[in-house]
């Protein structure tokens, strides 16, 4: 039995005037409708931004330590509802339950970090070059934040935007992925019961085109001060262009083609463990999923053998069980992955499973656990012999597929790692500190792992990428405060006279001709 979900604007449920319904289904049982969603239109998004604007002034006047108490309450409610939230995530987006629990824990960790920032939204007291004059800096909220998020991390990633934005005194309009609407609804209920005033957090269920049209109108009317977007590079570029017309810099967290370099002296067992987790965890649908393993030619064959062995031994199937990964999130991603599989050519060697493509009774996988016909399950694929001009090498694949490419020198490995033009996450497995720091210095990624996988974020470390992975903005930790606050400087002259900077400064005359 499904529930009809409607947008929440100014604290009130607002069914869409457009009258369109979207059915969010369980990807492990695609006939199971998790929720029916009343899809909003562009006007609804504009109304949500108006409600946020109306609520923001009063919210910004709440002292930051008190706003921190609300964040603390959100964290406690998340902890209390951890299992229930994780079950919704597993059912709606097919994430294995153990991973879903980890995702919910990330929200609690984020709240634990930011509740203290309510007492640490520090400005500075700065000395002046004039007597009887003092200089200050202050952090002020930007105003109204519109956060547009994807469904591969349907509750953790939204918390990266919403929690610090609220803590800093902003009001938020959140547009979650419509195929993860039940997750968004459950998460919104946590915020609503934490004591947030009406209008401070608004939730709009809409598809991409209506969201873009609504955002465009809201920006024209001056109703939005900051846009955060997690999603594809192509859509992120359009949002960046739109915001640029209004002299705004959005926070863009986009795709990744994340490399893992495995050197000749690497611990291959550890490297394979990392490749298995980051390449196939969440069915390869993380922005930080491993794209290409770039392996020294002397150990490449052994690495491929071990990874093939580990992948074949892993259980794929029902996300409620103990599996490496479950189904793809939605039909749209299954369709996209089918296109990716078409990039495999005759010169590639394919490993990892008893077949390729969608798992079914006619295309079975050894050790599969679940109902293959019911869900969007796909074989894991290892493609050995990818080259720098291959589509598989150059593009984000968003599915359970890992490429393998050989290298001879570290210079060549770094060039290969940077070649696709993304810059989110990168990893190196080595025992040589000189290689570690050479790699760190020259890799374009915003995040680097050493002897660890390309996936895995901690709540107090900056998260974000460069190039095709983002515009340099960072989420998480103290660094995200610069996304949701603006610096204001103030000078206070209490001398009783006009003192002109640079012109009325007392000069001390040195004897620069002195020599010993």
Protein language model regions, located:
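Glycine-rich loop-to-alpha-helix module at the N-terminal edge of alpha/beta enzyme cores
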Residues: 30-122, 132
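Rossmann-like NAD(P) dinucleotide-binding subdomain of oxidoreductase/dehydrogenase enzymes
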Residues: 123-270, 407
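Short, well-ordered beta-strand elements within core beta-sheets of diverse protein domains
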Residues: 34-40, 54-61, 147, 260-263, ...
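Conserved C-terminal structural/oligomerization subdomain of aldehyde/semialdehyde dehydrogenase
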Residues: 32-35, 224, 261, 312-315, ...
